[in-house]
UniProtKB/Swiss-Prot annotation:
Name the UniProt record assigns to this protein: 15,16-dihydrobiliverdin:ferredoxin oxidoreductase
HAMAP family linked to this entry: PebA
InterPro entries documented for this protein: DiHydbiliverdin_OxRdtase (IPR023658), Ferredoxin-dep_bilin_Rdtase (IPR009249)
An individual GO BP term: phytochromobilin biosynthetic process
UniProt catalytic activity: 15,16-dihydrobiliverdin + oxidized 2[4Fe-4S]-[ferredoxin] = biliverdin IXalpha + reduced 2[4Fe-4S]-[ferredoxin] + 2 H(+)
Catalytic activity, EC: 1.3.7.2
EC top class, as a word: oxidoreductase
Keyword set includes Chloroplast: no
Keyword annotations: Oxidoreductase
GO molecular function, one term: 15,16-dihydrobiliverdin:ferredoxin oxidoreductase activity
Task of the protein: Catalyzes the two-electron reduction of biliverdin IX-alpha at the C15 methine bridge.
């Protein structure tokens, strides 16, 4: 379902000078033969970004997932890029969230960085996230203009690909704009804000239970704290585990 979008994302990263980086040992890929599911992840080094991670989960007709978060360099105060795409094939249900995730909720910060996303929300009114903001804490890492898509196969094959491409283009444009001007938030503060994002997200990640059900607790704990949110407070507390040792039976 999401392989064309995954290739589009990777292609756009390569065009911007991105090169693949090493994923922590044992976290590059994991499989559950019993559930016929697998997850594969990539880490990218991209000019202007501290890290850019991508993950793709394939559980057949049960579930398809594409997730990515981009962390700009500390000397750039632009929002993080976050996307979560989920397809439940048996129910023919799509859930997609695409957002520029703000470091702070200050009005002047939002005005500086979110004009492009505002335009996209107007361009794709069917993806307006206004009604879904009740699902998220509006004061923590979500913007008022996130793109939210929930629907069936028609949206998955028509609305989503066009919005996905426009979203990526918009974020690259924002990055180019920020590369040409000074950041208004000091680099040391941006670093602390990105660390706070990892801590907040690791504590609340709704996908952790999903990963655990497919790939076991030990592997999923490592994945959460060593790959998804490595700056979280528990990053060094999870012992190494063999990916095959803790699969659910």
């Amino acid at each position: 379902m999401f392989d064309p979008l995954l290739e589009k994302l990777h292609s756009s990263i390569r065009i911007q000078g991105g090169e693949t980086a090493a994923v922590p040992d044992g976290l590059r890929e994991c499989r559950n033969e019993k559930k016929n599911s697998w997850i594969r992840s990539w880490l990218w080094q991209v000019p202007g970004f501290r890290r850019w991670r991508v993950s793709r989960l394939d559980a057949g007709e049960s579930l398809q997932v594409l997730n990515s978060v981009a962390y700009p360099n500390y000397n750039i105060d632009q929002p993080l890029m976050g996307l979560d795409l989920l397809w439940f094939g048996k129910r023919q249900k799509l859930v997609a969230i695409l957002d520029f995730q703000p470091l702070i909720q200050d009005q002047s910060y939002l005005e500086r960085h979110f004009q492009g996303l505002k335009t996209l929300q107007n361009r794709f009114p069917e993806l307006s996230g206004e009604e879904t903001m009740r699902l998220f804490d509006p004061n923590q890492y979500f913007s008022p203009w996130l793109l939210f898509c929930r629907g069936g196969a028609e949206k998955a094959t028509n609305s989503l690909p066009e919005a996905f491409n426009a979203f990526l283009h918009c974020y690259w444009e924002l990055h180019q704009q920020n590369s040409d001007k000074a950041s208004l938030i000091p680099a040391a503060e941006v670093k602390q804000l990105q660390i706070a994002y990892d801590i907040y997200s690791a504590e609340r990640d709704p996908a952790h239970g999903l990963f655990t059900s497919h790939f076991g607790k030990a592997w999923s704990d490592r994945f959460l704290h060593e790959f998804l949110f490595p700056a979280s407070t528990k990053a060094d507390s999870s012992p190494p585990a063999d990916a095959d040792d803790d699969l659910p039976r």
